[in-house]
Each structure stands twice: as C-alpha cells, then as structure tokens.
C-alpha cells in the first residue's frame, strides 16, 4: 500500500495493531511530526516505536535516502513496526533496533531528530542521552501524565534547552443511531525541545 498524500495523518485503522502495543494516534502524530520539522533525507530516532506509526510517517515525509531508527525493547512492537513499514513501502528506510533506552541510543549513529513516545521513568535519561548524541536538532516527546511532563521539563531545564509544551485534546465523532456522539481520547502533552 502506498500513502498518496503529502500530509501526515494516516488513519489509525490503516496500521496493523496488536493488543498492548501502543500507537501514537493520527491527530497527535500529525502535530508531533510537524513539531519535528523533518527534512528530506534526514535521520530520526523513534524511541519507543510501538506499532511504528511515527516511524512510517516520518520515513514517508523524509523520502528517499532518509533513515528512521525504530527503537523498542518489545519484540512484538518491532515486528509490528516492520510489517507496517513494509505495508507502506518504507522498509528500506526503517531500521529496527531492539534495546532499552537510554542505553541503546549510544549504539546508534548520530541523528538530529528524536521522537520519544512515552519513556516512563527513563524519560529524563532518554532526553539527556538524545541531547548528547546530537550537535543541533529537535526532540519531541509525547506524554500523558503530569509526572512525565514534570520530569521532562525538569530534565530540559537542567540541560538549559529552550522548549515548548502543547496539550492536545482530541474527540472523535461516533455514530449512535441517528446521532453523532463525540468520544474523547486521552489528552496528550507534546514537548518540543531545541538542542
């Protein structure tokens, strides 16, 4: 399958998914990708790739000659990422990396763009490792808890980086008989830092 559009936001249902493997939803993914300011032929590290939705869309946007390092410790997540990359014709640009962040980041080539999908308790260490691996670039992290937001902002402050925080609330309409009911997704904080 090819995605014929130049804009991000591949519908969630077009990605292969599995129970327990997280996916950055289309609306949040679109904003995160725009915050990354991806370039043709660029290099992105997707930490906690899950289903690979960000990896796939980034590879499509950056085009031929680009590299996306899709990092996850979960073998099932990496297999989903592989299948989704194949489905959308970008398997040649997506490199699967099994390992735990932040340690595994030291094994990767330098990149000027990092996307962190979650990170949990390791989020501050992941941010610090990413900054150490780039001369100049952008880090975008999506988090859902206030604790993760606080940890990320504190880590960025300690590093002296400029950053911005955007909170996104998404509700999708669902038909219920004659009516359309708006169903909310979890609010997400998108943290963008400039190194």
Swiss-Prot record:
Keywords: Cobalamin biosynthesis, Methyltransferase, S-adenosyl-L-methionine, Transferase. Pathway: Cofactor biosynthesis; adenosylcobalamin biosynthesis; cob(II)yrinate a,c-diamide from sirohydrochlorin (anaerobic route): step 8/10. Transmembrane segments: none annotated. GO terms for biological process: anaerobic cobalamin biosynthetic process; methylation. S-adenosyl-L-methionine binds at residues 24, 48-52, 72, 101. Pfam families: Methyltransf_31. InterPro entries: CbiT, Cbl_synth_MTase_CbiT, Cobalamin_biosynth_MTase, Methyltranfer_dom, SAM-dependent_MTases_sf. It is an enzyme of class 2 (transferase). CDD domains: AdoMet_MTases (cd02440). One of its GO terms (molecular function) is protein methyltransferase activity. Signal peptide: none annotated. It catalyses: Co-precorrin-6B + S-adenosyl-L-methionine = Co-precorrin-7 + S-adenosyl-L-homocysteine + CO2. Its EC number is 2.1.1.196. Belongs to the methyltransferase superfamily. Archaeal-type CbiT family. PANTHER family: COBALT-PRECORRIN-6B C(15)-METHYLTRANSFERASE (DECARBOXYLATING), COBALT-PRECORRIN-7 C(5)-METHYLTRANSFERASE. This is Probable cobalt-precorrin-6B C(15)-methyltransferase (decarboxylating). It comes from Pyrobaculum calidifontis (strain DSM 21063 / JCM 11548 / VA1). The lineage of its organism: Archaea, Thermoproteota, Thermoprotei, Thermoproteales, Thermoproteaceae.
